[in-house]
A protein has these predicted regions:
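C-terminal motif of bacterial Sec signal peptides marking the signal peptidase cleavage site
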Residues: 3-5
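Non-catalytic macromolecular-recognition regions in eukaryotic signaling proteins
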Residues: 8-190
Length: 190
């Protein structure tokens, strides 16, 4: 399972204050300022993890901060109908996001794909084009896992940009369709 990064919270008011929000038996602090979120962006709520002692393997660790189902080493993700009609949220590939605790990074859907791909993790995972993870505290293990995944209009090999510590790396993830050299996905819905 693949899980997402955490932040000290998710966007909210423009007051600059933080507020605790009870979720899944955990308390998460969601940042509300000064880094205001734009439309299409979300911040991972650190307390929404589903595993506080997650393992990065067999996923590929990218820039030392996040483990993703990157091709060709990981099979393409299977998809199912999301129930959200025929648009860009038509199919969903459920897979967790695994993040290294205490790190800050962004997951970004490149501009050419924003009309057909969204990403999101947490409770609930909000379909977004940019997910911010901001220094989720170490609460047991080095890696934290979050529920969520990828929404897409049609199966494809898609790019995702990871940005951390002044570095950026583009990776490719098979969402319902295999990337070159990647094993085929099970449970694909065209």
């Amino acid at each position: 399972m693949l899980l997402a990064a955490c932040t000290s919270g998710t966007g909210g008011s423009s007051t600059g204050k933080t507020s605790p929000v009870a979720t899944s038996g955990h308390v998460s602090v969601r940042p509300t300022g000064p880094a205001r979120l734009l439309p299409g962006e979300s911040a991972l709520a650190c307390g929404d993890y589903i595993d506080n002692n997650a393992q990065a393997a067999p996923l590929q660790v990218v820039l030392g901060v996040v483990a993703l189902p990157v091709s060709p080493g990981y099979p393409a993700l299977g998809t199912s109908l999301s129930g959200d009609g025929n648009g860009p949220l038509r199919l969903f590939a459920k897979t967790g996001l695994v993040i290294r605790s205490g790190t800050r990074f962004e997951l970004i859907v490149p501009a050419p794909f924003t009309s057909r791909l969204s990403i999101g993790w947490g409770s609930p995972g909000i379909p977004s084009h940019r997910v911010l993870v901001d220094n989720c505290a170490d609460i047991g293990g080095a890696w934290l896992a979050y529920a969520g995944g990828y929404w897409i209009d049609h199966p494809a090999c898609v790019p995702v940009i990871v940005r951390a510590g002044g570095k950026q790396q583009e990776v490719h993830i098979g969402v319902g369709a295999a990337c070159p050299g990647q094993r085929t996905a099970a449970g694909v819905r065209p």
